[in-house]
C-alpha cells in the first residue's frame, strides 16, 4: 500500500504547490489524481517517485518510509513515473513506454501480465 500523509512542497517559499496532500492507494488498485492545470498533479507524482523531496509529510510504501528516498531507490521498490507528452520515447510502443520503469525489477512475464490488465480496464 502507498500512503501519503500531509505532503507539502513548493518550488520556492513564495510558491507552495502542495499543501497538506494525503491519500492512500492499495496494492493492485488504480487511482486517478484529478485537477486543473497547475494544481500539483505532476508535482505530487514526482514527489512520490523520489524526483522531488517534500518540505513536510510522509510517504510510506508497504509500511516502509520512503520520504525523501532518491528516485533510484523508489524505483527499486516498484514505483515509477511515466513521463508526460514529449518525455515519452517516440520510437517505443505504448506497452514499451509503460513498462520502462518495471525493467529494473520484474521479468517480462510479470510486465506483460500487469500491462494486459491495464489494457483490459482502459482499452
Feature-to-residue mapping (PLM):
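Conserved structural motif at the start of ABC-family nucleotide-binding domains
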Residues: 2-4, 17-18
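Conserved ABC transporter NBD signature motif
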Residues: 57-64, 77, 110-115
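ABC-type ATPase nucleotide-binding domains, specifically the catalytic core motifs of the NBD
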Residues: 12-13, 31, 69, 94-113, ...
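ABC nucleotide-binding domain signature
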Residues: 32, 75-86, 116-118
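Short coil-to-beta microelement around the adenine-binding A-loop and adjacent beta1/P-loop entry
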Residues: 14-16, 72-73
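The feature captures the beta-strand-to-loop junction immediately N-terminal to the Walker
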Residues: 34-36
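Helix-to-loop junction immediately C-terminal to a conserved catalytic motif
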Residues: 49
